[in-house]
Amino acid sequence: MPVKKKPLKEDGFVFETTGGSVTDIDTSDMAGRSVSFDAHFITGKIMDFGKVLTGIPLYSYQEEIAYRIIYSVITFEGSVLTVLLSRQSGKSETMAFVIDTLTVLLPALAKIIPDLEQFSNGFRVGLFAPQSDQVVTTYSRAMTRLTSANAEMVLSDPDLLVSLESEVRLNLSNGSFLAGQVASKQSKIESKTYDLIIIEEAQDTDDFLVTKSIEPMLSATGGTLVKVGTTGITKNHFW
């Protein structure tokens, strides 16, 4: 069932977008797979699109995180990226920005950039966390941003024409989706394939589960694994 559209303001976007310029981000240490397009230029444009789509005002450190993830995805680095931030510093908001931006835009870019053909039928994101409420936090934020008036305006653009196909799940008409799963020791989570995986509260996620079940889900796609968390009390795959 299509999601009911919200009324739009006549004078443009509902949320004012703020933040610094992506040209201020240090990209000297980024080197992905050889692609035929200017990866940094495209990453910058994707970031600009995401700000309009979501209306999320990112701080400079959040922009650097989002930029690094997006660059890794479109260059098929196959990287494992670690995001270590304190509590209440905007981890979930940053991940929601990345999820919404890539699920909406990458299938459209795949039609005009041959290197991104892998995403022509949708961009697949897996979201994992040790407890269900931790999954819900990021999942719900991503859904909220995609049902905003800002997003409705962007999604209805003739060059995109993307819509949510559910009121409770992030499944888009372009084939993209966000799947949220609990990553506890008792979980059975094999047999899925993703282009991007995000592990929330990575410091509390079981080492064996990450190695045996989660990491192989990216092997066929050259996808990016993002481990997000804060400091823990034991040393594991996160630290």
Where are the regions that the model predicts?
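Phosphate/NTP-binding elements of NTP-utilizing enzymes
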Residues: P2-W239
